[in-house]
């Protein structure tokens, strides 16, 4: 059982096999500290921002007298996501520099690998477990990029075989190879580097004659993921270069990126 708001959480546990179970507190709530504990195969995993601004994941054999040890260490300006469990695999996500990444750890070997299933450098991946069978080695991966329409693949974690299951239909037709996507960093007023995602048609001239539309949104921790948009492409097809600035106020570079663009720091959003 979990009680939480935007910056505080408290969680209780009990043994479902007990006749008259009494909820037990895992950790007393503390302002500014978020945590979420999940169990799998006799282990307990704590996704928390305690002493880790962009979160970390600790592991313990017990909740009665927990002895938390590092499972996934905190990283500067890398937002650590939660865990998804299968019988033989642990799947997790990270976000840094306005890019999401997926990692898969083999429980038997202890080896963790990043799931790389495209040669594109700017894209949005996502893993989902649409089946109830936790014994499976197959997951579904959603994928899109500024030039590639939304796709869903089935992916076998053992064989690494990938199959296209569904693709977003574009009635007017669409060829991703007609577009070029680039990522650069731009220095803001205080020296912080702001990621820019640039999308253009391959035939658009870079001689200064093309129009450019600069878009940015940085509020409430909402990240502007580099995903696909038919509306955007209708402009790009008219030789307009589209640039998305991943400015502060979102969480493209972690919690600090958000905090540097809110409240008394809101000016940074507009300066970026």
Kindly label every feature range from the protein language model:
Residues 6-13, 52-59, 98-104, 147-154:
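Structural motif
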Residues 16-34, 61-84, 108-129, 158-178:
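Multi-bladed beta-propeller domains
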Residues 1-5:
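Conserved small/polar residues in nucleotide/adenosyl-binding loops
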Residues 12-14, 27-29, 35-38, 49, ...:
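A structural signal for the main folded, soluble domain(s) of proteins
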Residues 25-47, 74-89, 93, 121-142, ...:
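Conserved beta-propeller blade repeats
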Residues 124-272:
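Serine-hydrolase catalytic core recognition
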